[in-house]
Amino acid sequence: MKRILAVDDEPDVFETVEEVLSSYSVQTAGSFEAARRLLVTETYDMVILDIMGVRGLDLLDIAVEQNFPAVMLTAHALDPGNVMESMLRGAVSFITKENIDRLDSLLEELFDLLEKGESTWVHTMKRLAPMLDACFSPEWRDAYKEMGLLDF
């Protein structure tokens, strides 16, 4: 069974993640320090990190150093800057809390892409594009196209 670490400062998020990811072994941490300890002492197949409340980007650096793929989680509306920062620091994907009920299918897709050696970010950007288009003008796409993450 694949091991997942979910890090968030909201206990109700843990309940939802554990319910949605019932086919995985899920461990949770509610603070930066608790998550940091787990990241350096345990092994995970995937890490899910809240981007804001628990210093998720700092935890992302640790997860990447430990070679754990990480999905960034945010309660806030999509922000191309947060998406870009997450990608540049090594996250494999990004999801909003409003879409957390889709986390199981996202992880299945990510594990499949990682196993095949394919880009997780091309997949992620195709999934996020309609939401980003609705929130921002189409210019957000230019930077991602230059990086080879968009081909549409």
Predicted regions mapped to residue ranges:
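Alpha-helical interaction/dimerization surfaces of two-component signaling modules
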Residues: 16-21, 38, 62, 85
